[in-house]
Structure formats: C-alpha cells, structure tokens
Amino acid sequence: VWSRTPRRGATWNRFCSNDTAVVYLRDGELICRAIATPQRLKGQEPKDFISGGIKSEGKFSFQYGRAEARIFTKPHNGNFPAFWMMPQDGSAGWPKAGEIDIWEQINTENVSYHTLHSHWTYTLKHKQNPTSAVQSHNIDYSRYHTFAVEWTPTLISWYVDGEFVGSAPKSTDSDVLANGQWPYTKPFYLILNQSVGDGSWAASPDPNFVYETRFDWVRVYQTKAQNPTLTAIARNVIAPLSPSQNDEDADDAVHKASLWYDLSGRRINNFNQGHGIVVNGEGQKMLLPAH
C-alpha cells in the first residue's frame, strides 16, 4: 500500500530521503523524521537535511468517505509535518488538480491546520469565498491526537479527536466552479510525512534538533451510500478483526450485516481470528496500518 516519498522541488519534499534514519517502523508505529544529514552520508548526500515520508500513490486511493490517523508530533521552530491527500490523476497540475490537507502543524504552535488547495483558492486567492481552510487551537501536542477528514461530493469537513472543527463547501456559483473551486471529484491518495520549513510559512530548520512525527495508525471508511470506490485491496493491508460466523450457520440478519473478505477482496465462508476487511450494515470499512 505504501512507498516512500521521493525528493522533489517543493518545500515539503525538498529533503526527502529513503534513508532508514528518517522513515522506519518502531513499536508498530511509522516514524518520520527530519534531521541534519548524518556524517556517514556526507559526500553522497547533497542536502544539509534529510526527511522522510510515505504515500499510497498508485497503490491505494479513494473517492469520498472518511480518512483519519492517530498522530504525535514534536513542536519546535521549523517543524512542518502533515497528513494529507493528493489526486491519483494529477495531470491537471498543482493546484488545479486539488489538494486536501487533513492536518498540518508548524513551528511551536498549538494549532492544527486543515486546508483545501485549488486553482480558485491558491492561484486566484479566493480563500474565503467560500471557506477553504479551518483551524483548531489549544492543541496539547504533548500527547497523541486523531485527525480526520470527511469528504462528500459537496462538503469537506475536519475533526480533531472526534470533535468537529469546520467545513469547506462546494460552491453553488457556476462561475466559481468554472474557475476550479472544486476539483475534489476524483480518487485521492494519502501522504504521511515529516518536513521542515524554509522560512516562508514554517521557519527554517534547526540543525541541532531531531524533528519527529509518529503515525500510530491510518484508517479509511466509506458508506454504502457513497458507493465505495476504494481502488486497491492489497495483500499487505492488515487489520485485526474479530471472528465471524460460518456463512452456512449465520442467522440471515447477521449474514447481511457482517460479510467478510480476504485481503484480495474475495468472499470467504469460514473466517477465524486474523486479518481482513469488513463490510457491515453501516457500509464498507477498510483499515490501513501505517506500515
């Protein structure tokens, strides 16, 4: 489901590296770091910093639903981690193809940023017509928090620890839509990363500090009403689930409410304690670990 984020020219990925010092697993969590380039890499690494992240591009994307992650970060001047989404089809280019920032934090701020980027909001600078960004204040970053987005055809809403923060609606003005306000009509993939600022928003990094963000888990949900559009079911998608009844023995109501599949999406009649995907009475639920 995941691959490491490659180095490119944007602020967030200008230091990206495959080195295990900046993207690795520890105690079941994904650890993403940004650090001054280690001495062992001097001579082969042209940058003064290296940073880590992962993405599901080309492996997992979805259209409409809820995505959430449990995250811990270490605020410090220059900190710039993110949990966000980009379009699987990015042929229109950025920002026309759109961007959904589920969560960002910068520097030492106790704020969570939740933002949409599009041609309308970024290039034409209509950020409040309609609203395209909301914030949550007084976040205690000394502990873990769950950050979530809910995405429908006409509304994108953000949550922190299950509490509603705010929403960004699709405009009803045809001229606004014609100018690229709502490109959120196609599948998007997930990105989890630790970056550092360049002074334009987040401050420039401190070479003596180890920037670190921990991603405990990532989950994606879709309801039946959203006509589930998960575009990948990979064998390395792992989610612990409880046992179900045998198809032949199940009560009809239970049978309809609890259908089980293997990791390739195939129906299974006998399901013992283990891992899989559940489609229940509320819709389809797919759990993705950050590893």
Which ranges hold each PLM region?
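C-terminal outer-membrane/trafficking sorting elements
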Residues: 236-291
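GH16 jelly-roll
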Residues: 1-230, 234-237
